[in-house]
């Protein structure tokens, strides 16, 4: 790489949206990462292992150029195409996200003597059986790792067999220049468009519609809450594989009038400013980007005590927290906040203050420093 002006990096992920999802959380991260890398020092390319999917169109519309492998997770043709891309674009290092990407990327890196970074983004209940074999073979030889939270780092060390001294925790954060405070009139008008007046209480959940995200539990809590506060509603933002089932589940319980599905929204950072409380009832998470957004706009937060959420939030200070699946405690917390204006105000202020610790440019800077350290090691 002697004499090169820039370091060529290939970011390889599993997919941008997954099944029935417009945009995955990882893809949303790429949307703000890619334009912010220092182009005088780095040429960063973005590739999906799975290929073109529903979310790729959103990525392209945002101005990103994409590459694809286009084969199944364990299809060896991934390796052949990846090697071609590495050679064609003179790639210096690979930054890998996800099982398939991590498998073929590490093999290609070993064959071509290219360094790789494994980036852990979530905690799973178990590693697929075939992947366990892969991780036992490749994990101990992984030299560079990043994790979105300390719990994800621990997961990578325990289940992916990556040496504990190579995994660095780097919180994603959020670019503050993408947060635009909305006026009181705008928020009032938007709520009105969705049938909510100024006295209605809006609870919000943002994210992929998956069974483990806790949407049903939040709706069960809403049923309890409406016995005391009948004008409380939930807005659900996002799409995903659980969408049809969740719609049917809500309809079967006669809740269609108080659970509003807004689908995938590009203006999510504006809409969440209309919430009275933002809910994070997941059973597992890495550190959701939606949590960084909620902090940045100063929302009152109620969250399950899982993984990265438990790291970022402090119960009773920056959020009220509960054990995942505890519907009664979730309902109690919501009622307490809605019935105690000074508590809501305190949570909002603490949320905004906590967000100052998660400037997204710190994440970019940390990644760029790692790229340069790896590059320097290659020259020795």
Regions found by a protein language model. Give the residues of each.
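Short hydrophobic beta-strand element within catalytic cores of glycosyltransferases
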Residues: 46-48, 300-303, 313
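A conserved, positively charged/aromatic
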Residues: 118-146, 161
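A short helix/loop element that forms part of the nucleotide-sugar donor recognition site in Leloir-type
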Residues: 180-196, 343
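Conserved acidic donor-binding segment of nucleotide-sugar-dependent glycosyltransferases
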Residues: 315-316, 320-327, 336-341
